[in-house]
Regions:
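Conserved hydrophobic helix-helix packing surfaces used for dimerization/oligomerization
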Residues: 8-10, 31, 281
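Predominantly flavin-linked oxidoreductase catalytic cores and closely associated redox partners
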Residues: 113-251
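Conserved Rossmann-like nucleotide-cofactor binding loop
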Residues: 16, 39, 164
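Conserved N-terminal glycine-rich FAD pyrophosphate-binding loop of Rossmann-like flavoproteins
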Residues: 38-58, 62
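FAD/FMN-dependent oxidoreductases across multiple families
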Residues: 69, 231-311
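Glycine-rich FAD pyrophosphate-binding loop
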Residues: 25-45
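A conserved beta-strand/loop capping segment in the N-terminal third of enzymes
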Residues: 58-108
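Beta1/beta-strand and adjacent pyrophosphate-binding region of the FAD-binding site
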Residues: 2-16
Length: 311
């Protein structure tokens, strides 16, 4: 039988898990947050934080830390539909800008904030199993790198471990509003492609691509096509990616003058909602609901989930 060593155990320490652990610890709950990764480390993400997410960082006292890393603000969103472009400020007077911090920076900042708030952080810890007793989640079993399996108990276990959540698999929540993958997208980073504080997206028939600035003078450029074309297009990702950019010739010229600084990364994701709570457990972030990344809402939604869960 698991002993309730902790009030809450959070599985996953990235954009959903660390804020959840931080806010719980600030309220005085004895909190453990675990992740199989160590930090700083990267993950597949286009890492755009829309203004509502920026406001959350400000509420938590973390925005100044982010801006101190040199992440450039994004003060204009422009949507190019071909015949016309709609552009304007992305936010409000309270939250006028967006940011796109690299996950190596943002996730480390959030993990450190959770630790400073009093949460116990275990990096490099792999959860093997969720402990369920009499229909209620009571803890986890797992191990550190090279270590023996240990059990930890808690009143509540929160799954912040992404769309392939081990916690969700263990508790088997109702899943609804399911949609298959609709889009396949790839992104990479370019130097010599100044954005001057702009997020630019281009909407074309069966294609969409966008660009925005991030750390170290780099610009993230992502493009996508229908999932039905994914198998054919993955045979030449770079060629199909560059061909797609030609649908906006002036933008393609800017990319040709730039230098690619990283490999292509990409994915296609299914869309679903899961019931996010039950006896002794809850789900936050992509573990609770996952949506096509064309919205770039994942980080903002993870922050919102953290606050809703703790409240």
């Amino acid at each position: 039988m698991a002993v309730n060593t902790y009030d809450v155990i959070v599985v996953g320490a990235r954009c959903a898990g660390s804020p959840t652990a931080m806010l719980l610890a600030r309220k005085g709950y004895k909190t453990l947050v675990v992740d199989r990764a160590t930090f700083p480390s990267d993950t597949i993400s286009t890492h755009l934080v829309h203004p509502p997410g920026v406001v959350a960082l400000q509420r938590w006292g973390l925005l100044d830390r982010l801006t101190a890393t040199g992440c450039p603000p994004i003060d204009t969103y422009a949507f190019d539909f071909g015949p016309f472009t709609i552009s304007g400020a992305p936010g409000t007077d309270e939250a006028p800008v967006a940011y796109s911090p690299r996950r190596t920076v943002l996730d480390k900042l959030l993990v450190d904030a959770a630790s400073e708030a009093g949460a116990e952080v275990r990096e490099g810890f792999t959860v093997e199993d969720v402990v369920i007793e009499d229909g209620r989640v009571t803890g986890i079993r797992g191990h550190g790198k090279g270590g023996a399996t240990v059990s930890e108990g808690a009143r509540v276990v929160i799954g912040a471990d992404g769309r392939h959540s081990l916690v969700a698999r263990a508790v088997e929540p109702e899943q609804y509003n399911e949609k298959p993958p609709l889009l396949c997208g790839y992104y990479t980073y370019w130097s010599g492609l100044p954005m001057n504080g702009r997020f630019e997206t281009y909407i074309r028939p069966d294609r969409g691509f966008a660009a925005w600035p991030t750390h170290d003078g780099l610009t993230l450029v992502i493009g996508g096509w229908p999932f039905a074309e994914s198998n054919a297009n993955k045979k030449d990702i770079e060629g199909n990616y560059l061909d797609m950019l030609e649908l906006a010739p002036a933008f393609a010229d800017r990319v040709r003058a730039a230098t690619r600084e990283a490999r292509f990364a990409g994915t296609a994701v299914s869309n679903f909602f899961r019931k996010p709570y039950g006896p002794g457990w809850a789900l936050v972030g992509d573990a609770g609901y996952n949506k096509d990344f064309i919205t770039a809402q994942g980080i903002h939604d993870a922050f919102r989930d953290a606050e809703l869960c703790v409240d």
